[in-house]
C-alpha cells in the first residue's frame, strides 16, 4: 500500500508520467479505498462504470453476462449450433430484452450504492458506460430504479452526471461519435454503446463536456474494455486514469460458458418461457 501511495503521489508531482495505472479488484470496499488514497479533487474526478456484472448482476444465470457471452461467441464462431438459442443476432438481442424484463437484477456488492453516494456527495462526477444498445434503454432504467440508483425521482447518473457544452445532462438524441458505425445513445447519464469501443467512447465524451477532468476511475468486469481504455489513454499526459478490472462476477461468467449442465438448464428455462409466450401471444416470433 505505501508503494501505491508513493506511485500516485509521484504521478501528481510529475504529470508527464500520469497515464494509466492498472488494478484488479473484487470488491467495492477496495475501490473505495483506492479512491480515498488517490486524494484527487472530487470536482475534477470522473468515475466511469460499466453496468452488467460491475454495478448490477442478474439474480440467475439466464440472461446474464455469462449467458450472453456464451451465445454471442457461438454465433461468431459457428461452433456447436445446436447450443444456440437463435442464429440471428437481432433475435438474440430481443431475447435478452425479454429476459431483462422478466428476471430481477441486484447490486454486485453491498458497498456499491454507499460508495457512489459518498463520492457524488463530495462532488465527483459519474458516468454509466454500457455495451447495451438502445433496445435495452427502457429495461436499464427500470433495473437501476429497482436497485435504488436514484436521487429523489431522478437517476443518480443523471443528477450527478456530466454537463455538456449545450448545458444538458440528458441528450435525447444520438450521441455523435464519428468513429462509430452503430447508433450510440446518451440518456440520463448513461451511454448505450451497442458494443462499440469503450475507450473511444470515453474520448468522445471528454471532447464534448464543459468540466475539466483531471482524474478518471474506470471500473469494468471485462478485460477487453480494460485494454480498450489503456489504448485510448496511454498517451494522454493530461489525465491520471485508474483502470480497474472488477473481477467479482468473473467466475460465475466462466462457469456458464463452460459448464454443459448449466447450459442445458438454461435451454430448458428458456423453452418454458418461450412456450408460455407462444400461448399468450398470437404468432410469436419465438
Which residue stretches match the model-derived regions?
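Sec-dependent signal peptide recognition
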Residues: 1-8
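N-terminal signal peptide c-region/cleavage motif recognized by signal peptidases
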Residues: 13-15
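Structural beta-sheet core signal
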Residues: 128, 218, 243-245
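Short, surface-exposed basic-aromatic patches at helix termini and helix-loop junctions that form
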Residues: 142-149, 206-210, 230-239
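Conserved Lys-Pro-Asp/Glu-containing loop-to-beta segment of HAD-superfamily phosphomonoesterases
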Residues: 198-229
